[in-house]
């Protein structure tokens, strides 16, 4: 990955709320399925904004911080996804998205961020990201002290 796109908590909240506004009316949904781990925080925001209390998870391991590896389903939510929103933070190459589509063919699959290779696999997303860009999510970062330039 050549570029980095840093996401702050504020940015994530704004993007998730914009996405939630397009998922109204909320009474059309039975619940939300969060793709663990990237979809957990966005799912919480969507659940709040839409007033949805039923939130389940599908647990898929594919990344080890900045390396994408073999896809492994650790836990899945029951059903075919009918009436459910499935949320992940990002669709990248489409590996996870293809697995989600197979497991939940009737779900409405959304992400906050989408790269070109994965875009056709989601029903909606909020932010376009170039394919070669690595996204730094706020839950993967910490605020640290940086010395002033004059002190170096």
UniProtKB/Swiss-Prot annotation:
The residues that hold Mg(2+) are: 89
What is the name listed in the Swiss-Prot or TrEMBL entry for this protein?
A: Xanthine-guanine phosphoribosyltransferase
Signal peptide limits:
none
Which locations, inside or outside the cell, does it occupy? Cell inner membrane
Name the top EC class: transferase
The job of this chain, per UniProt, is described as: Purine salvage pathway enzyme that catalyzes the transfer of the ribosyl-5-phosphate group from 5-phospho-alpha-D-ribose 1-diphosphate (PRPP) to the N9 position of the 6-oxopurines guanine and xanthine to form the corresponding ribonucleotides GMP (guanosine 5'-monophosphate) and XMP (xanthosine 5'-monophosphate), with the release of PPi. To a lesser extent, also acts on hypoxanthine.
Q: What is its main location?
A: membrane
Give the record's subunit note.
Answer: Homotetramer.
The record's annotation in NCBIfam families points to: PRK09177.1
Per UniProt, the keywords (alphabetical) are:
Cell inner membrane, Cell membrane, Glycosyltransferase, Magnesium, Membrane, Metal-binding, Purine salvage, Transferase
Annotated xanthine binding lies at 92, 135
Q: Record's family?
A: Belongs to the purine/pyrimidine phosphoribosyltransferase family. XGPT subfamily.
Pathway membership of this protein?
Purine metabolism; GMP biosynthesis via salvage pathway; GMP from guanine: step 1/1; Purine metabolism; XMP biosynthesis via salvage pathway; XMP from xanthine: step 1/1
